[in-house]
Structure formats: C-alpha cells, structure tokens
Amino acid sequence: MGLLSILRKLKSAPDQEVRILLLGLDNAGKTTLLKQLASEDISHITPTQGFNIKSVQSQGFKLNVWDIGGQRKIRPYWKNYFENTDILIYVIDSADRKRFEETGQELAELLEEEKLSCVPVLIFANKQDLLTAAPASEIAEGLNLHTIRDRVWQIQSCSALTGEGVQDGMNWVCKNVNAKKK
C-alpha cells in the first residue's frame, strides 16, 4: 500500500464516537449549553421533560451528548443513562447560591455511582454573565472538588448564553477522552 492510499484511508476514517452525559439541576443551563454547542438558536428554550440528544463534531470526535432533565422528579431516572458514559458534564447555575448545597449533594452522589467510576468530569460553572454569579474557584472550594481523587476533573467558568468559556471546556473534554481511551 502506497503512502497516498494510507493518507486517503486515514482521511476517510470516521470520527471516534464519544458518549457524554450532561447533568445538573433544573434551570442550570444544560439545554442552552447543548444548543450553543450545536450552534442552534437559544432564544426559546423550555425545561427539558425527559432528555435531548445531539451529536456535535469536534476535533475528530463525534460527541453524542445526552441532556437529561434536572427536575427533582426526573433525577431518580438519571441512573438509566450512566452505562457507557465516556465523559460526565455537570452544569451548575453559578448565580443560584441558594441551591449550591443541593447541587453539591447531587454531584457527590453521581461521583459515588459505580457505573460512573473513573469517568472524567467537567463541571461548567455556568451563568458567569450574571453579576451575582459566584466565581468557579469559590464553587470548587464549596463543593470540595479538591478531594476528588479517582478521576480527572475540571471546573470551567462559562456562559451558555454568550458562549464564553464553552469551547475551553469542550477542548478539555476532547483532550481527556483521548487520554481515557488510549
């Protein structure tokens, strides 16, 4: 096989598929984030009843993102989506300080789940465009993220509305999928 045919074969190689689970409390901005990633209109978003799935191409990956509703009545069903998750993205409303304890409890429970053990986690500290938003460093400290030892993790400031910080988070995702799958 000549060099040219090898290059053609590499070029036509399909993107590596990655299963991403997008979780967080209701109104954290998960669906807005997903639509921002897919370059879709974000002006009319309603609470997710059940789930949304979108595939997004990024850096040689086909990211299959499962956006699961965050209302309290839906959260018990989250576990039905854990299987074969490559990356967990957890979205926090940085401006809703009254719910930091609740979101911290939910995240801690997710990190204890056997089916999610060792799965890299990206925490998006969303809504940074709001004046009342807590900085990512304060959220990381409040959630004791420094105690996470069984997986790689990252907290990323972002605004799903403006798109700021979203690409930085997705770059981290693509880097860590590669590291995990080697």
Swiss-Prot record:
GO terms for molecular function: GDP binding; GTP binding; GTPase activity; magnesium ion binding; microtubule binding. Expressed in the retina. Strongly expressed in connecting cilium, the myoid region of the inner segments (IS) and in cone photoreceptors (at protein level). It is found in: Golgi apparatus membrane; Cytoplasm, Cytoskeleton, Spindle; Nucleus; Cytoplasm, Cytoskeleton, Microtubule organizing center, Centrosome. CDD domains: Arl3. Its main location: Golgi. Changing Y90C: In RP83; uncertain significance. Keywords: Cell cycle, Cell division, Cell projection, Ciliopathy, Cytoplasm, Cytoskeleton, Disease variant, Golgi apparatus, GTP-binding, Joubert syndrome, Lipoprotein, Magnesium, Membrane, Metal-binding, Myristate, Nucleotide-binding, Nucleus, Phosphoprotein, Protein transport, Transport. It is a peripheral membrane protein. Found in a complex with ARL3, RP2 and UNC119 (or UNC119B); RP2 induces hydrolysis of GTP ARL3 in the complex, leading to the release of UNC119 (or UNC119B). Interacts with RP2; interaction is direct and stimulated with the activated GTP-bound form of ARL3. Interacts with SYS1. The GTP-bound form interacts with ARL2BP and PDE6D. Microtubule-associated protein. May interact with GOLGA4. Interacts with GGA1; the interaction recruits PKD1:PKD2 complex to trans-Golgi network and is required for ciliary targeting of PKD1:PKD2 complex. Interacts with DNAAF9. Small GTP-binding protein which cycles between an inactive GDP-bound and an active GTP-bound form, and the rate of cycling is regulated by guanine nucleotide exchange factors (GEF) and GTPase-activating proteins (GAP). Required for normal cytokinesis and cilia signaling. Requires assistance from GTPase-activating proteins (GAPs) like RP2 and PDE6D, in order to cycle between inactive GDP-bound and active GTP-bound forms. Required for targeting proteins to the cilium, including myristoylated NPHP3 and prenylated INPP5E. It is linked to Joubert syndrome 35: A form of Joubert syndrome, a disorder presenting with cerebellar ataxia, oculomotor apraxia, hypotonia, neonatal breathing abnormalities and psychomotor delay. Neuroradiologically, it is characterized by cerebellar vermian hypoplasia/aplasia, thickened and reoriented superior cerebellar peduncles, and an abnormally large interpeduncular fossa, giving the appearance of a molar tooth on transaxial slices (molar tooth sign). Additional variable features include retinal dystrophy, renal disease, liver fibrosis, and polydactyly. JBTS35 inheritance is autosomal recessive. This is ADP-ribosylation factor-like protein 3. It comes from Homo sapiens (Human).
